[in-house]
Amino acid sequence: KEGYIVNYYDGCKYACVKLGDNDYCLRECRLRYYKSAGGYCYAFACWCTHLYEQAVVWPLPNKTCN
């Protein structure tokens, strides 16, 4: 599974500036999911890869980013 990492409180994606390989996104994806997850910056948000099927990613139901 793949998807944008999301803030559970406000429903927003984790923003990033440096597109492509990005240490911040990789670190956040691994902290949120697990150490074998991958992550990079895509369309100015952190995209996580190699996730388990039940991983919660953007968009969250009934939550809009404010």
From Swiss-Prot:
PROSITE patterns hit by this protein: LCN_CSAB
Keywords associated with the record: Disulfide bond, Ion channel impairing toxin, Neurotoxin, Secreted, Toxin, Voltage-gated sodium channel impairing toxin
Any one GO molecular function term: toxin activity
GO cellular component, one term: extracellular region
GO biological process per UniProt: defense response
Disulphide connectivity of cysteines: 12-65, 16-41, 25-46, 29-48
Tissue expression profile of the protein: Expressed by the venom gland.
Domain LCN-type CS-alpha/beta: 1-66
Cell location: Secreted
Signal keyword on record: no
InterPro entries the UniProt entry points to: LCN-type_CS_alpha_beta_dom (IPR044062), Scorpion_toxin-like (IPR003614), Scorpion_toxin-like_sf (IPR036574), Scorpion_toxinL (IPR018218)
Family: Belongs to the long (4 C-C) scorpion toxin superfamily. Sodium channel inhibitor family. Beta subfamily.
Comment field on protein domains: Has the structural arrangement of an alpha-helix connected to antiparallel beta-sheets by disulfide bonds (CS-alpha/beta).
Function statement: Beta toxins bind voltage-independently at site-4 of sodium channels (Nav) and reduces peak current and shifts the voltage of activation toward more negative potentials thereby affecting sodium channel activation and promoting spontaneous and repetitive firing. This toxin is strongly toxic to mice.
Protein name: Beta-mammal toxin Cv3
Lineage of producing organism: Eukaryota, Metazoa, Ecdysozoa, Arthropoda, Chelicerata
